[in-house]
Swiss-Prot record:
Protein name (record): UPF0353 protein MMAR_2288
Highest taxon of source: Bacteria
Domain VWFA: 98-294
Membrane topology: Multi-pass membrane protein
Organism of this sequence: Mycobacterium marinum (strain ATCC BAA-535 / M)
Biological classification of the source: Bacteria, Bacillati, Actinomycetota, Actinomycetes, Mycobacteriales
One GO CC annotation: plasma membrane
Length: 335
């Protein structure tokens, strides 16, 4: 949990748990304090004349005189917890990752069920995604229809990606499997040259499409979408799929209206086989929301961070309270 002015405070993930042995020292100090108090009481009872004792003994609020010592012991416990090094989950921007944005540019993207049409809405949302993605991530762009083309190799230059998005052109057919294989190849290529670790950088494919694969027609074909998704799973590259559009979309081809309903099932299957997540969006606002969610998932990683400062601050506050209580109640520091 996080407390105002104190910061995160947890009781897990201790980096130096052996510091808890100091609890025995604190327990020993408490025992010494109790023994001294008992001995003091015995000395006081040696007075035969209790009336004389009451007349010479200072007036003290006996019920509260142990509060300073109790607060002092509590502060030592809090300092011990801090020294043990508790940790908590911290989200930090990634500075070593690859994301391939794969966009369907087949003729079905002309459909106007999403204003002004699916393609323009996709371009605007993708550009916003590129702008908001954390700066250290290498973002690449692939456009696909009957074939897949790497328009931008993974780079931190967001302007290159946005410029390429503005130049997307419609084409025939939909080869989703080839697009995924092309993205995997681009990830492998850039992973070989990105330093900063003993393992390849984490990678993800964001697949944006509105329709069913048409080339090949069987997604389990060696070049099909399902086969490519399984390969992505084997390579540790999850695919986040976004199916965009409505069941009522259509396009005009040769003066004939062709229905192009969004195909959610294929996209869900691709995501499932790859170990990723599937999303659907029927409006530009929903698409922006999906991209915002992906940005949070992709752009940040969770690590264990130090959470001892909150315990140190709380311990210091309790220690100050112990000193004030001693001055107010006992007119001296606790002994």
């Amino acid at each position: 949990m996080t407390l105002p002015l104190l910061g995160p405070m947890t009781l897990s993930g201790f980096a130096h748990s052996w510091f808890f042995l100091f609890i025995f020292v604190i327990a020993g100090l408490i025992a010494v304090y109790v023994v001294l108090q008992l001995a003091r009481q015995k000395r006081m009872l040696r007075f035969a004349n209790m009336e004389l004792l009451e007349s010479v003994a200072p007036q003290r609020p006996s019920r509260f005189r142990h509060i300073p010592a109790m607060l002092l012991a509590l502060s030592l416990v809090l300092f011990t917890v801090a020294m043990a090094g508790p940790t908590h989950d911290v989200r930090i921007p990634r500075n070593r990752a690859v994301v391939m944005l794969v966009i369907d540019v087949s003729q079905s993207m002309r459909a106007t069920d999403v204003e002004p049409n699916r393609m323009v809405a996709a371009q605007e949302a993708a550009k916003q995604f590129a702008d908001e993605l954390t700066p250290g991530i290498n973002l690449g762009l692939i456009a696909y229809a009957g074939t897949a083309t790497v328009l931008v190799s993974p780079t931190t230059n967001r302007e290159a990606t946005k410029a390429a998005l503005d130049k997307l052109q419609f084409a025939d057919r939909t080869a989703t499997g080839e697009a995924i294989f092309t993205a995997l190849q681009a990830i492998a290529t850039v992973g070989a040259v990105i330093g900063g670790g003993d393992t390849p950088p984490p990678a993800r494919i964001v697949l944006f499409s509105d329709g069913k694969e048409t080339m090949p027609t069987n997604p389990d074909n060696p070049k099909g979408a399902y086969t490519a998704a399984r390969t992505a799973k084997d390579q540790g590259v999850p695919i986040s799929t976004i199916s965009f559009g409505t069941p009522y979309g259509f396009v005009e081809i040769n003066d004939q209206r062709q229905p192009v309903p969004v195909d959610d099932e294929t996209m869900k299957k691709v995501a499932q086989l790859s170990g990723g997540n599937s999303y659907n969006a029927a409006t530009l606002a929903e698409l922006n929301s999906v991209y915002a969610s992906l940005q949070q998932q992709i752009g940040y990683e969770t690590i264990r961070g130090d959470a001892s400062m909150g315990w140190l601050r709380l311990g210091a506050l309790v220690l100050v309270a112990a000193a004030l209580a001693a001055l107010l109640i006992n007119r001296r520091l606790p002994t």
